[in-house]
Amino acid sequence: DILPDTPSGVSGGSKLTKVTDGAVAFDGADGTALSLDNNSDIQLGSGTNWTIEFFAYRTGAFVNYDVIAGKGANSTYEWFIEGFADGSVDILYSADGSTTWTGQHEIMSNMALNRWYHIALVRNGSGANNFKAYVDGIQTFQTTAFNIYAGTGVLHIGGYNGATAQDPPITISNFRIVNGSSVYTTDFTPPTRELTDVTNTKLLCCQSNT
């Protein structure tokens, strides 16, 4: 399904405006996530510069560990962006591929229902405060840059096809992975048009329902 009013910008500092560039709606049913096979372009590994970004619109309640997007398998963890029952959204990652997370950091404390958000996760170099999360262009978190296990797991968007009850009711638009560049390094005005194939773009999807 495609949500009629899909996002491409913001009005003021709070709500994203109506957009016309397309999105993919996930209804929360098991096995309905978008899955993409592994390739080296989307293995973040120890790369010092990368960006994951997308627009998201939650249409129902999260349960703990709902997968908004992520890469990895049941036996080999890489990274996941997950929603929780209290409405918060975290990034979880493994540096060694084990099934114990190396780190878990909150991106936002509450993703409200029926509202578009632009979310961006950025690594910009190595060292202190070189990983940052942004929601609607405002930095919400920073920490020391971290490595992510460069595994061969599938990339999942809008749920997790490797298990049951990890599929949120959510609409995703303009999902982009840039591997080799940091698109944002400080607070910014969220995009007002569909995302484009900038330098080092390795994946750009969910711009229509096909």
Kindly give the residue locations of the regions a language model identified.
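Short surface loop/edge beta-strand patches of beta-sandwich-type extracellular domains
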Residues: 27-50, 72, 102-110, 161-164, ...
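Short hydrophobic/aromatic patches on beta-strands that form ligand-binding or substrate-lining surfaces
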Residues: 51-60, 69, 119-121, 157, ...
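Surface-exposed loop/edge segments in extracytoplasmic proteins
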Residues: 77-78, 99-104, 138-143
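Extended recognition patches within non-cytosolic domains
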Residues: 1-29, 132, 138-141, 172-210
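Short, aromatic/His-centered strand-loop micro-motif at the edge of beta-sheets
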Residues: 92-118
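Extracellular glycan-recognition modules
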Residues: 32-92, 125-130, 166, 181-186
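Extracellular glycan-interaction patches encoded by glycine-rich segments
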Residues: 71, 96, 151-173
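Extracellular repetitive beta-rich solenoid segments
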Residues: 74-75, 112-115, 127, 196-201
